[in-house]
Protein backbone atom coordinates (compact mmCIF):
# COMPACT_ATOMS: atom_id res chain seq x y z
CA UNK A 1 0.00 0.00 0.00
CA UNK A 2 1.09 3.55 -0.73
CA UNK A 3 1.35 6.59 1.48
CA UNK A 4 -1.54 8.40 3.11
CA UNK A 5 -1.02 12.16 2.92
CA UNK A 6 -3.12 14.94 4.45
CA UNK A 7 -3.83 18.17 2.59
CA UNK A 8 -4.90 21.07 4.82
CA UNK A 9 -6.43 24.03 2.94
CA UNK A 10 -5.70 27.07 5.12
CA UNK A 11 -5.79 29.90 2.59
CA UNK A 12 -9.20 31.34 3.50
CA UNK A 13 -9.67 35.02 4.27
CA UNK A 14 -11.87 34.42 7.32
CA UNK A 15 -13.90 37.59 6.71
CA UNK A 16 -16.85 36.38 8.80
CA UNK A 17 -14.66 36.24 11.88
CA UNK A 18 -14.34 40.03 11.79
CA UNK A 19 -10.71 40.11 12.99
CA UNK A 20 -7.56 41.58 11.49
CA UNK A 21 -5.75 38.29 11.97
CA UNK A 22 -6.93 35.45 9.74
CA UNK A 23 -8.91 32.87 11.68
CA UNK A 24 -6.43 30.03 11.17
CA UNK A 25 -3.80 32.08 13.03
CA UNK A 26 -6.05 33.10 15.93
CA UNK A 27 -5.13 31.63 19.31
CA UNK A 28 -7.24 28.81 20.75
CA UNK A 29 -5.99 28.23 24.30
CA UNK A 30 -2.61 29.81 23.58
CA UNK A 31 -2.01 27.98 20.29
CA UNK A 32 -3.06 28.98 16.77
CA UNK A 33 -6.11 27.16 15.45
CA UNK A 34 -4.08 25.75 12.57
CA UNK A 35 -1.50 24.31 14.99
CA UNK A 36 -4.26 22.37 16.77
CA UNK A 37 -5.47 21.05 13.41
CA UNK A 38 -2.01 19.91 12.34
CA UNK A 39 -1.48 18.26 15.72
CA UNK A 40 -4.66 16.19 15.33
CA UNK A 41 -3.44 14.81 11.99
CA UNK A 42 0.12 14.28 13.23
CA UNK A 43 -1.22 11.91 15.89
CA UNK A 44 -2.70 9.50 13.33
CA UNK A 45 -0.16 6.72 12.66
CA UNK A 46 -1.53 5.97 9.17
CA UNK A 47 -0.82 9.52 7.95
CA UNK A 48 2.73 9.69 6.61
CA UNK A 49 2.85 13.33 5.51
CA UNK A 50 1.02 16.66 5.64
CA UNK A 51 0.84 19.43 3.03
CA UNK A 52 -0.30 22.89 4.14
CA UNK A 53 -1.93 25.16 1.57
CA UNK A 54 -1.79 28.83 2.53
CA UNK A 55 -2.54 32.15 0.85
CA UNK A 56 0.08 33.11 -1.75
CA UNK A 57 2.82 35.08 -0.04
CA UNK A 58 2.03 33.70 3.42
CA UNK A 59 4.43 30.78 3.31
CA UNK A 60 6.97 32.57 5.52
CA UNK A 61 4.23 33.81 7.86
CA UNK A 62 3.01 30.24 8.28
CA UNK A 63 6.54 29.11 9.07
CA UNK A 64 6.88 31.79 11.74
CA UNK A 65 3.43 31.54 13.36
CA UNK A 66 2.70 27.83 13.02
CA UNK A 67 5.73 25.67 12.30
CA UNK A 68 8.44 27.46 14.27
CA UNK A 69 8.48 26.23 17.85
CA UNK A 70 6.08 23.32 17.24
CA UNK A 71 7.45 19.79 17.08
CA UNK A 72 5.68 18.74 13.89
CA UNK A 73 7.31 15.76 12.19
CA UNK A 74 5.12 15.13 9.15
CA UNK A 75 5.06 18.48 7.30
CA UNK A 76 6.11 17.76 3.72
CA UNK A 77 5.49 21.15 2.14
CA UNK A 78 3.83 24.54 2.48
CA UNK A 79 2.35 25.49 -0.89
CA UNK A 80 0.49 28.59 -2.13
CA UNK A 81 -3.25 28.28 -2.67
CA UNK A 82 -5.65 29.98 -5.04
CA UNK A 83 -8.67 32.26 -5.14
CA UNK A 84 -11.06 29.50 -4.03
CA UNK A 85 -10.86 26.60 -1.61
CA UNK A 86 -11.23 24.20 -4.52
CA UNK A 87 -8.23 25.70 -6.30
CA UNK A 88 -6.20 25.56 -3.10
CA UNK A 89 -6.97 21.89 -2.62
CA UNK A 90 -6.01 21.21 -6.24
CA UNK A 91 -2.65 22.91 -5.70
CA UNK A 92 -2.12 20.68 -2.69
CA UNK A 93 -3.04 17.56 -4.64
CA UNK A 94 -0.61 18.43 -7.42
CA UNK A 95 2.24 18.65 -4.90
CA UNK A 96 1.82 15.08 -3.62
CA UNK A 97 4.28 12.28 -4.44
CA UNK A 98 3.27 9.71 -7.02
CA UNK A 99 3.17 6.85 -4.53
CA UNK A 100 0.29 8.46 -2.59
CA UNK A 101 -2.55 6.00 -2.05
CA UNK A 102 -5.08 8.04 -0.06
CA UNK A 103 -5.53 11.78 0.49
CA UNK A 104 -7.00 13.12 3.72
CA UNK A 105 -8.45 16.58 3.00
CA UNK A 106 -9.17 18.49 6.20
CA UNK A 107 -10.13 22.12 6.80
CA UNK A 108 -7.48 24.15 8.58
CA UNK A 109 -10.19 25.69 10.76
CA UNK A 110 -11.44 22.35 12.18
CA UNK A 111 -9.07 21.90 15.11
CA UNK A 112 -11.27 19.61 17.22
CA UNK A 113 -11.36 16.49 15.06
CA UNK A 114 -10.19 13.46 17.02
CA UNK A 115 -7.69 10.77 16.15
CA UNK A 116 -10.22 7.92 16.29
CA UNK A 117 -12.51 9.72 13.83
CA UNK A 118 -9.68 10.23 11.36
CA UNK A 119 -8.56 6.62 11.61
CA UNK A 120 -12.12 5.40 11.06
CA UNK A 121 -12.66 7.52 7.96
CA UNK A 122 -9.33 6.37 6.50
CA UNK A 123 -10.40 2.76 6.97
CA UNK A 124 -13.68 3.39 5.13
CA UNK A 125 -12.01 5.27 2.28
CA UNK A 126 -9.54 2.45 1.80
CA UNK A 127 -12.51 0.10 1.47
CA UNK A 128 -14.77 2.15 -0.84
CA UNK A 129 -12.54 4.85 -2.37
CA UNK A 130 -14.25 7.94 -0.94
CA UNK A 131 -15.55 8.68 2.55
CA UNK A 132 -16.30 11.69 4.74
CA UNK A 133 -17.26 12.51 8.28
CA UNK A 134 -20.77 13.91 8.74
CA UNK A 135 -23.48 14.37 11.36
CA UNK A 136 -27.28 14.14 11.08
CA UNK A 137 -28.83 17.61 10.98
CA UNK A 138 -30.68 18.63 14.13
CA UNK A 139 -32.88 21.35 12.68
CA UNK A 140 -35.56 21.20 10.03
CA UNK A 141 -34.10 22.49 6.75
CA UNK A 142 -36.07 24.55 4.24
CA UNK A 143 -35.39 24.98 0.54
CA UNK A 144 -36.20 28.55 -0.52
CA UNK A 145 -36.41 30.56 -3.72
CA UNK A 146 -34.54 33.78 -4.50
CA UNK A 147 -37.23 35.80 -2.75
CA UNK A 148 -36.90 33.83 0.48
CA UNK A 149 -40.14 31.87 0.17
CA UNK A 150 -40.16 28.20 1.14
CA UNK A 151 -40.55 25.88 -1.83
CA UNK A 152 -39.81 22.54 -0.14
CA UNK A 153 -39.08 20.89 3.20
CA UNK A 154 -36.70 17.94 2.74
CA UNK A 155 -37.06 14.93 5.00
CA UNK A 156 -34.72 15.67 7.91
CA UNK A 157 -34.07 11.96 8.43
CA UNK A 158 -32.20 11.92 5.10
CA UNK A 159 -30.10 15.05 5.68
CA UNK A 160 -26.55 15.05 6.98
CA UNK A 161 -24.17 17.96 7.52
CA UNK A 162 -20.87 17.04 5.92
CA UNK A 163 -17.61 17.79 7.69
CA UNK A 164 -13.97 17.04 7.08
CA UNK A 165 -11.79 15.01 6.92
CA UNK A 166 -12.87 13.78 3.53
CA UNK A 167 -10.64 10.93 2.38
CA UNK A 168 -10.19 9.71 -1.18
CA UNK A 169 -8.18 7.45 -3.39
CA UNK A 170 -5.55 9.82 -4.76
CA UNK A 171 -6.11 9.09 -8.44
CA UNK A 172 -9.88 9.46 -7.98
CA UNK A 173 -9.83 12.85 -6.27
CA UNK A 174 -7.17 14.19 -8.65
CA UNK A 175 -9.32 13.16 -11.63
CA UNK A 176 -12.39 14.72 -10.00
CA UNK A 177 -10.61 18.04 -9.57
CA UNK A 178 -9.17 18.00 -13.08
CA UNK A 179 -12.60 17.24 -14.54
CA UNK A 180 -14.17 20.08 -12.57
CA UNK A 181 -11.48 22.52 -13.75
CA UNK A 182 -12.07 21.56 -17.37
CA UNK A 183 -15.82 22.10 -16.99
CA UNK A 184 -15.57 25.25 -14.89
CA UNK A 185 -17.43 23.61 -12.00
CA UNK A 186 -16.98 24.84 -8.44
CA UNK A 187 -18.26 22.99 -5.38
CA UNK A 188 -18.20 23.74 -1.66
CA UNK A 189 -16.67 20.39 -0.77
CA UNK A 190 -14.54 17.74 -2.42
CA UNK A 191 -17.13 14.98 -2.14
CA UNK A 192 -19.34 16.85 -4.60
CA UNK A 193 -16.63 16.63 -7.26
CA UNK A 194 -16.34 12.88 -6.79
CA UNK A 195 -20.14 12.56 -6.85
CA UNK A 196 -20.12 14.36 -10.21
CA UNK A 197 -18.06 11.48 -11.61
CA UNK A 198 -20.79 9.06 -10.56
CA UNK A 199 -18.63 7.57 -7.82
CA UNK A 200 -20.16 6.55 -4.47
CA UNK A 201 -19.19 8.44 -1.32
CA UNK A 202 -19.61 6.84 2.11
CA UNK A 203 -20.62 9.09 5.02
CA UNK A 204 -19.46 8.10 8.49
CA UNK A 205 -21.01 9.68 11.57
CA UNK A 206 -18.61 11.98 13.34
CA UNK A 207 -18.96 14.37 16.26
CA UNK A 208 -20.90 17.60 16.66
CA UNK A 209 -17.76 18.99 18.31
CA UNK A 210 -15.89 18.85 14.99
CA UNK A 211 -16.97 22.37 14.10
CA UNK A 212 -15.46 24.62 11.48
CA UNK A 213 -14.48 27.86 13.18
CA UNK A 214 -15.99 30.58 11.01
CA UNK A 215 -17.59 33.18 13.33
CA UNK A 216 -16.84 34.58 16.81
CA UNK A 217 -19.60 32.34 18.17
CA UNK A 218 -17.76 29.29 16.82
CA UNK A 219 -14.65 30.42 18.67
CA UNK A 220 -16.56 30.50 21.96
CA UNK A 221 -17.87 26.99 21.34
CA UNK A 222 -14.43 25.68 20.42
CA UNK A 223 -12.94 27.13 23.60
CA UNK A 224 -15.65 25.41 25.66
CA UNK A 225 -15.21 22.05 23.92
CA UNK A 226 -11.43 22.16 24.34
CA UNK A 227 -11.69 23.18 27.99
CA UNK A 228 -14.00 20.24 28.67
CA UNK A 229 -11.60 17.83 26.98
CA UNK A 230 -8.71 19.12 29.05
CA UNK A 231 -10.74 18.62 32.23
CA UNK A 232 -11.42 15.00 31.26
CA UNK A 233 -7.72 14.39 30.69
CA UNK A 234 -6.66 15.74 34.09
From Swiss-Prot:
Task: Report the InterPro entries cross-referenced here.
Answer: IspD, IspD/TarI, IspD/TarI_cytidylyltransf_bact, ISPD_synthase_CS, Nucleotide-diphossugar_trans
Indicate the segments annotated as coiled coil, or none if absent: none
Cite the entry's keywords alphabetically: Isoprene biosynthesis, Nucleotidyltransferase, Transferase
GO annotations under biological process?
isopentenyl diphosphate biosynthetic process, methylerythritol 4-phosphate pathway
> What are the site positions for Transition state stabilizer?
16, 23
Q: What is its EC number?
A: 2.7.7.60
Its transmembrane ranges are none
Q: In which pathway does it act?
A: Isoprenoid biosynthesis; isopentenyl diphosphate biosynthesis via DXP pathway; isopentenyl diphosphate from 1-deoxy-D-xylulose 5-phosphate: step 2/6
Q: Where is this site: Positions MEP for the nucleophilic attack?
A: 156, 212
Under the heading CDD domains, the entry gives: CDP-ME_synthetase
Q: Name one GO molecular function term.
A: 2-C-methyl-D-erythritol 4-phosphate cytidylyltransferase activity
Q: Which Pfam families match?
A: IspD (PF01128)
Is the keyword Transferase assigned to this protein? Answer: yes
Enzyme class (EC, first level): transferase
Role summary: Catalyzes the formation of 4-diphosphocytidyl-2-C-methyl-D-erythritol from CTP and 2-C-methyl-D-erythritol 4-phosphate (MEP).
The family note in this entry says: Belongs to the IspD/TarI cytidylyltransferase family. IspD subfamily.
- This protein is called what? 2-C-methyl-D-erythritol 4-phosphate cytidylyltransferase
- Name the species this protein comes from: Desulforamulus reducens (strain ATCC BAA-1160 / DSM 100696 / MI-1) (Desulfotomaculum reducens)
Species lineage, top-down? Bacteria, Bacillati, Bacillota, Clostridia, Eubacteriales
